[in-house]
Protein backbone atom coordinates (compact mmCIF):
# COMPACT_ATOMS: atom_id res chain seq x y z
CA UNK A 1 0.00 0.00 0.00
CA UNK A 2 3.01 2.32 -0.16
CA UNK A 3 3.11 4.92 -2.93
CA UNK A 4 6.12 3.34 -4.63
CA UNK A 5 4.46 -0.08 -4.94
CA UNK A 6 2.96 -0.64 -8.38
CA UNK A 7 0.61 -3.50 -9.30
CA UNK A 8 0.20 -4.38 -12.95
CA UNK A 9 -2.41 -7.14 -12.81
CA UNK A 10 -3.68 -7.42 -9.25
CA UNK A 11 -6.94 -9.36 -9.22
CA UNK A 12 -7.34 -10.36 -5.55
CA UNK A 13 -6.51 -8.59 -2.27
CA UNK A 14 -6.54 -10.62 0.97
CA UNK A 15 -6.38 -8.53 4.15
CA UNK A 16 -5.73 -10.53 7.31
CA UNK A 17 -6.41 -8.98 10.73
CA UNK A 18 -8.57 -6.42 8.93
CA UNK A 19 -9.24 -4.40 12.06
CA UNK A 20 -5.59 -3.38 12.26
CA UNK A 21 -5.75 -1.41 9.01
CA UNK A 22 -7.39 1.98 8.70
CA UNK A 23 -10.15 2.78 6.20
CA UNK A 24 -7.82 4.96 4.14
CA UNK A 25 -5.19 2.22 3.97
CA UNK A 26 -7.66 -0.35 2.69
CA UNK A 27 -9.25 2.07 0.24
CA UNK A 28 -5.84 3.10 -1.07
CA UNK A 29 -5.02 -0.50 -1.88
CA UNK A 30 -8.18 -0.86 -3.95
CA UNK A 31 -8.11 2.47 -5.77
CA UNK A 32 -4.44 2.37 -6.71
CA UNK A 33 -4.99 -0.89 -8.59
CA UNK A 34 -8.38 -0.17 -10.15
CA UNK A 35 -6.87 1.49 -13.22
CA UNK A 36 -4.64 -1.53 -13.92
CA UNK A 37 -7.34 -4.19 -14.21
CA UNK A 38 -9.43 -4.22 -17.39
CA UNK A 39 -12.68 -6.08 -17.88
CA UNK A 40 -12.45 -8.00 -21.17
CA UNK A 41 -16.14 -7.52 -21.99
CA UNK A 42 -16.35 -3.75 -21.73
CA UNK A 43 -12.77 -2.50 -21.54
CA UNK A 44 -13.43 -0.60 -18.31
CA UNK A 45 -11.15 -0.77 -15.25
CA UNK A 46 -12.37 -2.58 -12.17
CA UNK A 47 -11.13 -2.96 -8.61
CA UNK A 48 -9.63 -6.30 -7.56
CA UNK A 49 -11.65 -8.83 -5.62
CA UNK A 50 -11.37 -8.30 -1.87
CA UNK A 51 -11.27 -10.87 0.95
CA UNK A 52 -10.97 -9.54 4.50
CA UNK A 53 -10.47 -11.71 7.57
CA UNK A 54 -10.67 -11.00 11.28
CA UNK A 55 -11.62 -12.70 14.54
CA UNK A 56 -12.26 -9.34 16.22
CA UNK A 57 -14.37 -7.18 13.88
CA UNK A 58 -14.65 -3.52 14.82
CA UNK A 59 -18.11 -1.84 14.78
CA UNK A 60 -17.62 -0.47 11.27
CA UNK A 61 -16.80 -3.92 9.94
CA UNK A 62 -19.89 -5.39 11.59
CA UNK A 63 -22.05 -2.67 10.03
CA UNK A 64 -20.64 -3.48 6.60
CA UNK A 65 -21.68 -7.11 7.00
CA UNK A 66 -25.24 -5.98 7.73
CA UNK A 67 -25.71 -2.95 5.49
CA UNK A 68 -22.88 -3.25 2.98
CA UNK A 69 -22.66 -5.31 -0.19
CA UNK A 70 -20.52 -8.05 1.34
CA UNK A 71 -20.77 -11.81 1.25
CA UNK A 72 -20.04 -13.18 4.72
CA UNK A 73 -18.52 -16.53 5.67
CA UNK A 74 -18.27 -17.53 9.33
CA UNK A 75 -15.90 -20.12 10.77
CA UNK A 76 -17.71 -20.95 13.98
CA UNK A 77 -15.54 -23.77 15.27
CA UNK A 78 -12.21 -23.94 17.05
CA UNK A 79 -9.44 -26.07 15.56
CA UNK A 80 -9.66 -29.69 16.66
CA UNK A 81 -8.44 -30.29 20.21
CA UNK A 82 -8.68 -26.67 21.35
CA UNK A 83 -10.31 -25.94 24.70
CA UNK A 84 -12.08 -22.77 25.91
CA UNK A 85 -9.81 -20.30 27.71
CA UNK A 86 -10.67 -19.65 31.35
CA UNK A 87 -10.69 -15.84 31.72
CA UNK A 88 -10.56 -14.15 35.12
CA UNK A 89 -10.29 -10.61 36.47
CA UNK A 90 -7.90 -10.23 39.40
CA UNK A 91 -7.01 -7.29 41.65
CA UNK A 92 -3.51 -6.17 42.50
CA UNK A 93 -4.00 -7.16 46.14
CA UNK A 94 -4.73 -10.77 45.15
CA UNK A 95 -1.63 -11.47 43.05
CA UNK A 96 0.34 -13.13 45.83
CA UNK A 97 -2.42 -15.53 46.84
CA UNK A 98 -4.08 -16.24 43.50
CA UNK A 99 -1.82 -15.44 40.56
CA UNK A 100 1.74 -16.26 41.60
CA UNK A 101 0.82 -19.83 42.64
CA UNK A 102 -0.85 -20.25 39.24
CA UNK A 103 2.33 -19.11 37.48
CA UNK A 104 4.34 -21.69 39.41
CA UNK A 105 1.78 -24.39 38.71
CA UNK A 106 1.86 -23.84 34.95
CA UNK A 107 5.64 -23.66 34.67
CA UNK A 108 6.15 -26.67 36.94
CA UNK A 109 3.78 -28.57 34.66
CA UNK A 110 6.10 -27.85 31.75
CA UNK A 111 4.09 -24.99 30.28
CA UNK A 112 4.96 -21.35 29.57
CA UNK A 113 3.57 -17.94 30.50
CA UNK A 114 3.05 -14.56 28.81
CA UNK A 115 2.95 -11.41 30.95
CA UNK A 116 1.81 -8.29 29.08
CA UNK A 117 2.65 -4.70 30.09
CA UNK A 118 1.60 -1.48 28.36
CA UNK A 119 4.89 0.43 28.72
CA UNK A 120 8.49 -0.50 28.02
CA UNK A 121 9.92 1.45 30.94
CA UNK A 122 8.58 3.52 33.83
CA UNK A 123 7.48 7.10 33.23
CA UNK A 124 7.37 9.79 35.95
CA UNK A 125 3.89 10.05 37.47
CA UNK A 126 2.59 6.94 35.70
CA UNK A 127 1.28 3.91 37.60
CA UNK A 128 1.23 1.73 34.49
CA UNK A 129 3.39 -1.37 34.81
CA UNK A 130 6.41 -1.50 32.50
CA UNK A 131 8.18 -4.40 30.84
CA UNK A 132 11.59 -3.68 32.35
CA UNK A 133 10.33 -3.15 35.90
CA UNK A 134 8.02 -6.17 35.77
CA UNK A 135 10.78 -8.38 34.37
CA UNK A 136 13.09 -7.49 37.24
CA UNK A 137 10.33 -8.11 39.77
CA UNK A 138 9.42 -11.50 38.33
CA UNK A 139 13.05 -12.57 38.13
CA UNK A 140 13.29 -11.90 41.86
CA UNK A 141 9.99 -13.67 42.60
CA UNK A 142 10.81 -16.72 40.46
CA UNK A 143 14.60 -17.14 40.53
CA UNK A 144 14.37 -20.78 39.43
CA UNK A 145 12.61 -19.89 36.18
CA UNK A 146 13.94 -18.32 32.99
CA UNK A 147 12.29 -14.88 32.69
CA UNK A 148 13.01 -12.68 29.64
CA UNK A 149 11.43 -9.60 28.05
CA UNK A 150 10.37 -8.49 24.57
CA UNK A 151 9.34 -5.09 23.19
CA UNK A 152 9.15 -3.14 19.95
CA UNK A 153 12.31 -1.08 20.46
CA UNK A 154 14.53 -4.12 20.33
CA UNK A 155 16.46 -4.86 17.15
CA UNK A 156 14.73 -7.31 14.79
CA UNK A 157 17.37 -10.00 15.31
CA UNK A 158 17.06 -9.61 19.10
CA UNK A 159 13.28 -10.00 18.92
CA UNK A 160 13.60 -13.02 16.65
CA UNK A 161 16.07 -14.64 19.05
CA UNK A 162 13.77 -14.14 22.05
CA UNK A 163 10.77 -15.55 20.20
CA UNK A 164 12.79 -18.53 18.98
CA UNK A 165 13.90 -19.26 22.54
CA UNK A 166 10.33 -18.93 23.82
CA UNK A 167 8.93 -21.12 21.06
CA UNK A 168 11.55 -23.80 21.78
CA UNK A 169 10.78 -23.79 25.51
CA UNK A 170 14.02 -22.16 26.65
CA UNK A 171 12.09 -19.27 28.26
CA UNK A 172 9.52 -20.04 30.97
CA UNK A 173 7.98 -16.59 31.37
CA UNK A 174 8.00 -13.89 28.69
CA UNK A 175 7.27 -10.30 29.75
CA UNK A 176 6.22 -8.34 26.68
CA UNK A 177 4.38 -5.38 25.26
CA UNK A 178 1.58 -6.01 22.77
CA UNK A 179 4.07 -6.94 20.03
CA UNK A 180 2.95 -10.55 20.58
CA UNK A 181 -0.67 -9.63 19.86
CA UNK A 182 -0.76 -11.22 16.40
CA UNK A 183 1.29 -13.71 14.45
CA UNK A 184 2.61 -15.63 17.46
CA UNK A 185 1.87 -19.33 17.86
CA UNK A 186 3.36 -21.16 20.86
CA UNK A 187 1.05 -24.10 21.72
CA UNK A 188 2.94 -24.79 24.95
CA UNK A 189 2.01 -21.37 26.39
CA UNK A 190 -1.02 -21.86 28.64
CA UNK A 191 -1.18 -18.75 30.83
CA UNK A 192 -1.67 -15.15 29.71
CA UNK A 193 -1.39 -12.35 32.28
CA UNK A 194 -2.35 -8.81 31.23
CA UNK A 195 -1.44 -5.94 33.56
CA UNK A 196 -3.60 -2.77 33.58
CA UNK A 197 -6.25 -4.63 31.61
CA UNK A 198 -8.78 -1.81 31.95
CA UNK A 199 -6.65 0.29 29.58
CA UNK A 200 -7.09 -2.06 26.62
CA UNK A 201 -9.97 -2.34 24.18
CA UNK A 202 -12.02 -5.53 23.98
CA UNK A 203 -10.63 -6.42 20.55
CA UNK A 204 -7.06 -6.12 21.80
CA UNK A 205 -7.79 -8.15 24.93
CA UNK A 206 -9.35 -10.84 22.75
CA UNK A 207 -6.30 -10.92 20.49
CA UNK A 208 -3.89 -11.14 23.43
CA UNK A 209 -5.94 -13.86 25.09
CA UNK A 210 -5.76 -15.79 21.83
CA UNK A 211 -2.01 -16.27 22.25
CA UNK A 212 -2.80 -19.08 24.69
CA UNK A 213 -5.17 -21.98 24.22
CA UNK A 214 -3.46 -22.91 20.96
CA UNK A 215 -2.65 -26.46 22.05
CA UNK A 216 -4.63 -29.29 23.63
CA UNK A 217 -3.89 -28.25 27.25
CA UNK A 218 -6.36 -26.09 29.19
CA UNK A 219 -5.37 -22.41 29.33
CA UNK A 220 -6.11 -19.35 31.44
CA UNK A 221 -6.06 -15.60 30.97
CA UNK A 222 -5.77 -13.34 34.02
CA UNK A 223 -6.74 -9.68 33.63
CA UNK A 224 -5.10 -7.55 36.33
CA UNK A 225 -7.13 -4.43 37.03
CA UNK A 226 -7.01 -1.64 39.58
CA UNK A 227 -10.53 -0.60 38.61
CA UNK A 228 -13.50 -1.69 40.71
CA UNK A 229 -15.82 -1.59 37.70
Q: How should each PLM-predicted stretch be described?
A:
Residues 1-229:
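Inter-lobe coupling/hinge segments of SF2-like helicase ATPases
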Amino acid sequence: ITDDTIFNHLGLCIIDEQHRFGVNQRQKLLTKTARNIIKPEDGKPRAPHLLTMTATPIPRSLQLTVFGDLDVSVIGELPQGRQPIDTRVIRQNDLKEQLYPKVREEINSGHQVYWICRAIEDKPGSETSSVKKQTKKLQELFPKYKVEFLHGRMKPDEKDLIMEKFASGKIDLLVSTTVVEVGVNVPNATLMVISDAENYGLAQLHQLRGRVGRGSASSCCYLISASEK
